[in-house]
Amino acid sequence: MFIHDEVSVPELSTKNINRKRFYQTPEGKLYPSITTVLQKRKMAGLMEWRKNVGEDVANYIARTAAHRGTKVHHMCEDFLNNMESNYPEKWAEHKKNFLPYVLFGQLKPVLMQKVNNILAQECGLYTDKYRVAGRVDCIAEYNGVKSIIDFKTSRKERNDDWNESYYIQASAYAEMFEERTGVAINQIVILVVTEDGVVQEFVKDKGEYLPMLVEAIDDFTTDWEKENEMVHSSSDDVAT
């Protein structure tokens, strides 16, 4: 059984503006989601990949990967919530999703051996310092160290340098959580399970990625301001 010592944080609502996701804080402030902020960093590689494999193949892979990732994430969340032992009939529903369930089965021993004392799961967070928000997968002890833990699926094993955006995102969650609760989190953990059953563990210190977080937020803010200027300019032209 996993031990839960969950910290209370306020719920956040979401709002889409110009196809970008924002979170509204209890004080009424709108902050972009960290995934939206980091989208630009991923775009060049994605565009090149789409060009290489073709749009139809790319769309199929993206759809199946998103479905698989969502299912595995839900299984991890429910397992850490002790559903398998406390609500076996509900847990049995997961077995209907064969491939995600098999992938989760590879992750399960890692969760059992290394994760405990859970502080939060699927939790909305924000930071006034960085003016960004998001939803974290899991905050818990990993090998006895308080950590931001993110679950990922992949078709093949990932090189460490492919994960930079993951590390920046997890570092942002660490900053958000400390600002909201006063609990410092320095370790970030990305767990990746591949279709051939390999589990990769990437353990980092958030300090290395905070400068990159600031850079990504500055880039997003600059682009967002330019985009809004163009919208306002077009509106003024129509009005005249």
Predicted regions and their residues:
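Generic serine detector
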Residues: 8, 13, 33, 85, ...
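Glycine- and charge-rich intrinsically disordered segments
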Residues: 1-10, 226-240
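Metal-dependent nuclease catalytic cores that hydrolyze phosphodiester bonds in DNA/RNA
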Residues: 1-133
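Mg2+/Mn2+-dependent nuclease catalytic core
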Residues: 119-230
